[in-house]
Amino acid sequence: MTRPLILTLKMDDRSQGRFDRLRELHFPPERNYLNAHLTLFHKLPGDRETGISTDLQEVCRDQAPLTLTATGLRSLGRGVAFELTSPGLMSLRRELARRWGPWLGPQDRQGFKPHVTVQNKASPETARTLREQLQATFSPFEVEGVGLSLWRYLDGPWEPAGTYLFSERPKDGRT
C-alpha cells in the first residue's frame, strides 16, 4: 500500500525560521518532529504521486512567488496558529483542488483556512496563555511563498517527495 501524500507551501527562509523558532519553543518536544508548515492538502493518494508531481511542475512553472499576510492568531483549543491570507494562494489551491477533486478526502474538501501551527497538543490553559502573549505584541507581517513541497506521510514523520519552486517571473511575462 502506498503512503498518503501531504502538500505544503514552501516559505522563504526568514519566515520558515521565524515559525520554526516559535514551534521549538512552544510545541511539546515529544511531538515536535516536523518543521512549521502551511498545509494545502492533508491526504492525497500516494498511488497518484507521478500525476500529482506532473501537475505541480506545470502549475509552479507559471506561478510567481506569493505574498501572504499573517493577519492574526487562531486558537486551536489545545494550541495556537498564525492565520494567513493571500488571494494568490487561494487561487492556486482552488486550481489544484479542481484538478484533483475526484480523489480528495473530506478534510481536503472542507473550506481552506491557511495557517501555521506553532503550538498543539498542549493544555488549554497553556495554549490560552501563549495566545495572549503572542497577541500582546502581534502586528501583521508578510510571508513569501516560494514553492510547494510534497511529502509522504509515515504515520507521524514526513518524508520529502518533491520540491517545486515557483517561477521568478509572473505568468503574464511582465517583470
Outline where the language-model segments fall.
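Histidine-dependent nucleotide/RNA phosphoesterase domain, centered on the 2H-phosphoesterase fold
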Residues: 1-175
